[in-house]
Amino acid sequence: EKFDSGKILIDGVEISIENERAVRNIRREIGMVFQNFSLLERLNVYENIAFPMKSWGYSKKEIDQRVKELIGLVELTDKMDAYPKHLSGGQKQRVAIARALTMEPKILLCDEATSALDPKTSESILKLLKDINDKTGITIIVVAHQLSVIRDICTHMAILENGYLASSGKTIEVFVNEPAALRRLQAYKSNEANLSIVFQKNHSIELSQMIRDLNLDVNIIDMQHIGMDKKTVHYTVHVPNEKLETCMEWLEKKKIYASRLKGMEQIDA
């Protein structure tokens, strides 16, 4: 599709829609995972994964080696000869991920890749993507409406509103600083939260220590884990306004990441 204005840059190289050869070459470097799996029902797991390489004219030996490697990577070795109609949603998405990796792309684009899955299956797919990133170093771009997906797997995030970039940055910093765009997205029901804190470890002990040391009344509005290892915890809390500055000083001394929050009446500021 053509766009009205701007440029498309991949690895610093501008890609022109009019330059079909450039677009064709870059397609080999981008793998795509869709929400609805997009598997060919008449082909089995092995054949679905092999399809891109066959289309590009690779030898049978090259295809067999790569496909078996990827089937092992997505943990579907026992489903090699199965057809899509006999697979669960999670298994279908694993096949789709393997197929997207056949051409050894530099970028894996996941468009709502977990939105059609139940929470447990979604978590297993996110873990698989994280493992693939760790093992191969591939860049993974995730398009999602579920903030939990972004929070669990992404190191950086961007929020789009009406076609414009509303906010971006490191995931942990965006969730802590809670810009207006994120708060609109989250649609918080409470307007009392005035402090955002990220604990890297022992979150319950550190929070209890702060409450004890400062003699605080703390209302925990929200608590969310960040990252697949669940070690980093983000708290959104309300503390008495007269204690807010003291809390910030205490957290700074402990080298704990924290940020003041504005009231919801300022959400559009």
Name each model-derived stretch.
Residues 108-111:
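Catalytic Walker B motif of ABC-type/P-loop ATPase nucleotide-binding domains
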Residues 43-50:
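Short coil-to-helix segment of the ABC ATPase nucleotide-binding domain corresponding to the Q-loop/switch region
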Residues 119-121:
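Helix N-cap at the start of a conserved alpha-helix in ABC-type nucleotide-binding domains
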Residues 6-14:
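Conserved ABC transporter NBD signature motif
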Residues 13-14, 50, 54, 61-78:
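Conserved ABC ATPase "signature" region
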Residues 82-85, 102-103:
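Conserved signature/switch motifs of ABC ATPase nucleotide-binding domains
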Residues 2, 15-31, 55, 60, ...:
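ABC ATPase NBD coupling module
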